[in-house]
Structures are given as C-alpha cells and as structure tokens.
C-alpha cells in the first residue's frame, strides 16, 4: 500500500530564533537567524535580522519545516548598525513569539555588567552569558554568550525582553566575547527612516 504524501504546511511558522536562508539573485545563500517578527505602524508583517546576512532584494526562506520557497524579502538595511528589515507575506507566514526555549514579549534596553543575557540561534540554540559592557556610542553590547556561524541575527533577551541581536564573535566562537547591536538603536534607526518597519512591535 502506498504511503500518502505529506502535505506542505500552509504557512511557515517563524519567530525570533528561527533559522532563515537568504538568497540573492545569483543563487548564493546565507544561513542566519531571525531576530524578531511583528507588525510595523502600517500593519505590515515584518522581521529584523543581521544586516550582513543579505542585501535589499534578497529572498528570505524558512530553513526548516518548509518547501524552500520564499516567504519574504529584505527591503531595507542599516549598515552602520548591521541591521536588516524583512517584509513577509502574511498569507505565507504564521508569526509566533516563542521559538524553542525562548519567548519575546517586548523590547527594551540591555543590562549592564554583570547582568546575564541569553540568545536563541539556529546553530547553537539557547545560550547565556554575562554582559561585559554596553557601548552607547557604537550601540553595541559585548557579552560572553556562545555563538557560531549561522547565529547572526539571533535575538538577545533578558527574561522575555528583546534587548539586542547577535552580529559577530571576536576571533574564537564560544570562547571569545560576542558583539551585538542594541535593539534600542536598531528600532531607533528604523523609526527615524519612516519606511517599512517603522513603529515595529513584536508579536
């Protein structure tokens, strides 16, 4: 007796911590992590990730549990902060505020030393570490959170408050400090531009 084919899901389930693939017109693909998903002031379904993961116009594809077709597009980026904005097709995406062991209920400011923050990345999952410093000039936080390639864009939270994203590790993954953009700075830049993503609120 033939085994019935498994139907593809009607919508991709995505939230902060989901693995995403970003594909350019040449077919090059990067694997990163979605920082957060929600609606902007105009009601559009949008997300945020690390800017170095792709460029405006690149297709965004869920890495897991999907049929490999795009569900969104990078529509804007902020190179000084290494932040990118994704506009999603609401007919193809079911946004959630919990991925794995991490829940996001709002946004806020990073903690100071020796506060602990955690991230949820597509490569290393949920890991936590002490906050070494927050650079208010460069809008960065330095933490001891373990990250590896593919964790770029991962949400950094304190409790359930989204305070930043993962952008890079210094020299040695999971041993050296990790650098990330603060969510205050990311949302401030997006709001100031007044385009897609302005007025963002997470699911």
Can you name each region flagged by the protein language model?
Residues 1-8:
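Secretory targeting and sorting signals
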Residues 8-26:
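Short N-terminal segments immediately surrounding and downstream of signal-peptide cleavage
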Residues 26-135, 157-159:
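Serine endopeptidase catalytic core focused on the charge-relay Asp
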Residues 50-54, 146-149, 167-171:
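Short, solvent-exposed aromatic-acidic interface loops
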Residues 56-61, 152-156, 173-181:
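A short, polar/proline- and glycine-enriched secondary-structure boundary/capping micro-motif
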Residues 82-85, 138-146:
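Short, solvent-exposed secondary-structure boundary/capping segments
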Residues 88-101, 170-203:
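C-terminal cap/linker of serine protease catalytic domains
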Residues 146-166:
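Catalytic nucleophile loop of clan PA
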